Structure formats: C-alpha cells, structure tokens
C-alpha cells in the first residue's frame, strides 16, 4: 500500500493509503460479504460510510432530537482523534465475522512511503475500500450502551427522560443530555471508557 499525505483544512496533513489495483479488487469482494453483517450490527444513529445514509440524514436526526419542547438542552460534541490510525488490529480480528487470514494480511501489510516499507501495528488505512466499514464496526455499540444506561424510567408515577441521544457520522458524534452535569459526570466518562 502506498502512503500519500493530503492537506487538511486546519493546516495539518491526513495520511491516505492507496491500495494496489489487486488489493482494491480483493477489498471490494471482502466488503460485499462484510457490509451486510456490519449493517445488521450497526448503531441506528450512525450515518457515516453506510449505504443509503448521508449527512442529510444525520442532520435530520439532530433536528428531530433537538427541536421538541422537552428536548435536551445540552450537547456533548466529540471527534475521535486519529480514529483510523489507532484502531486495534486485535479488536478487529476478534470481532469481525469473516475470514481472519486475509483480514490480518491487510491489516499487517504496512505501507510504502518514499520507497521505504513501514510496518503497521494498529489502524486501518484511510483510502482502503474496507476501512470505513471496519472503523464503523469498532465504533458501533456505543448507542446501545447509552440507551441501556440512560433509559426512560418511571419515578413516583412520572416518566424521567434524561434525553441522552447519540448521532454519529464516522468518527464525529454528538450526544445530547438534559443537563450539563449529566453529560460531564455520567456520559463523558462512559464514552471515555468505551473509546
């Protein structure tokens, strides 16, 4: 895999992995098998790099959870820094339900930069066809954890809704909450443990 760097809007550079044509074809075939499995396990409010979902869908969900009279008043915004570069190979190998031999070869293939081969111990390259789906598999599950921990409960016959909702687009997300304290003291530590 060849490594190139493209400029980001903040002045930094983003590393991209450019697979060979053979690797691209193999990854496309692998993705045909992986994507249906990943879709059945995906968080309902995950919108990045998924079929039939877009930024518009993510924005509509944000609007839906934020405009009601009883909607949350606070938002925790998150961006998982270096998400693609820091994904655990072992987690992927343990949790992706397809052929591990091929997957491990891709993950450990390394990259070439300035005619020098560099090994890869973590991460999945941005630019790889299967990488966005692998990243989503790693990030899926947070919504389920939040929904279990912050479910609507009844106290003294009155519904108590903490208004905790997750909307994720790739490695960027927002989590809503009824109070700032709820987000800071309960949600944020949970997100930190998950990540």
Regions found by a protein language model. Give the residues of each.
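Generic detector of ordered secondary-structure context
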Residues: 21-22, 54, 165
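Active/ligand-binding-proximal structured segments within catalytic/core domains
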Residues: 26-34, 134-135
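Conserved polymerase palm-domain catalytic core
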Residues: 3-4, 9, 44-45, 57-195
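Active-site beta-loop-alpha junctions of metal-dependent nucleic acid enzymes
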Residues: 51-57
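Duplex nucleic acid-engaging cores and interfaces of nucleic-acid transaction enzymes
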Residues: 22-27, 59, 63
């Amino acid at each position: 895999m060849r490594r190139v760097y493209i400029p980001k809007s903040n002045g930094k550079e983003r590393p991209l992995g450019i697979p060979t044509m053979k690797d691209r074809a193999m990854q496309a075939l692998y993705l045909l098998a992986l994507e249906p499995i990943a879709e059945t396990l995906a968080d309902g409010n995950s919108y990045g790099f998924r079929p039939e979902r877009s930024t518009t869908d993510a924005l509509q969900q944000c609007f839906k959870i934020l405009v009601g009279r009883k909607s949350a008043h606070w938002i925790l915004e998150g961006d998982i820094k270096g998400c693609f570069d820091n994904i655990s190979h072992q987690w992927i190998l343990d949790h992706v339900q397809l052929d591990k031999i091929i997957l491990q070869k891709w993950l450990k293939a390394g990259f070439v930069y300035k005619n020098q081969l560099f090994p890869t111990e973590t991460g999945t390259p941005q630019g790889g066809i299967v990488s966005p789906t692998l990243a989503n598999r790693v990030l899926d599950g947070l919504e389920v954890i939040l929904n279990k921990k912050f479910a609507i409960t009844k106290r003294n016959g009155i519904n108590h809704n903490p208004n905790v909702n997750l909307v994720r687009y790739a490695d960027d997300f927002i989590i809503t909450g009824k109070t700032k304290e709820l987000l800071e003291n309960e949600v944020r530590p949970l997100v930190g443990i998950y990540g």
